[in-house]
Amino acid sequence: MRFFHFYTPEQVPSSGIPECAVAIDVLRATTTIATALAAGAEAVQVFAHLQQLQEASQNWPASQRLLAGERGGKAVAGFDLGNSPLDYTPDRVRDKRIFLSTTNGTRSLQRLEGIPVVITAALVNLGAVVDFLRRGSFAEVWLVGSGWEGAFSLEDTACAGAILHRLGCSLNQLGNDETLAALALYQTWQDDLLGLLRRSSHGQRLLGLGPENDQDLAYCADLDRLSVVPRQVQPGVLASGG
């Protein structure tokens, strides 16, 4: 396997698509998606725009759907859920379709939806993702961070580096400078991932919204907490796969 890392969806090439792409948004969309599916959600359907989400959700029975939205780190008024993974408990989400839109992560997923195999990764399901990639033996894999409104994200690149580290990638498998940088970043911070999340600009942004968000950071930094691999089963729809 040969790996390429892109800091944001805006950096993703428009041609030469790989066999597999991994969308990463540690704070917090891909952590939340993994948590929702591990808690028994039927699927998570992602949208870049809130209006599209609201329109599509009307085609789903009210008793079997939940609207989840976040903008600027805050829950969208009138929605059932925000983007805190701690809110996605089995009693709330089991057997429900989650209609989700976030500031960054859902844009990344929509950018990748035409690739044959699309999965999502976070620190909480790192081991499951690594096992999936090992079994797949894809010739080329893109690791795509979500960033923050088009800018670099420390935690997403660290997660990409964690995947490369766990896979034991050789230098020949690192397809661009960003993969080498990601690997170096993770190896520097691997013993203090919560510290990295707290120091990241988005971590600081969440803590500025309320000290209770430190619980989210601790959860998002908890390596291998979940064994689920969210996989795209149709454009924009993720279910438990692998």
Swiss-Prot record:
Cofactor(s) listed: Mg(2+)
The enzyme's E.C. designation: 3.1.3.71
Keywords: Hydrolase, Magnesium
Keyword Magnesium applies: yes
Molecular function in Gene Ontology: 2-phosphosulfolactate phosphatase activity; magnesium ion binding; sulfopyruvate decarboxylase activity
Listed Pfam families: 2-ph_phosp
Keyword Hydrolase (UniProt): yes
Coiled coil region boundaries: none
Catalysed reaction equations from the record: (2R)-O-phospho-3-sulfolactate + H2O = (2R)-3-sulfolactate + phosphate
Similarity comment: family membership: Belongs to the ComB family.
PANTHER family: 2-PHOSPHOSULFOLACTATE PHOSPHATASE-RELATED
HAMAP family: ComB
Protein name (Swiss-Prot/TrEMBL): Probable 2-phosphosulfolactate phosphatase
Organism name: Synechococcus sp. (strain JA-2-3B'a(2-13))
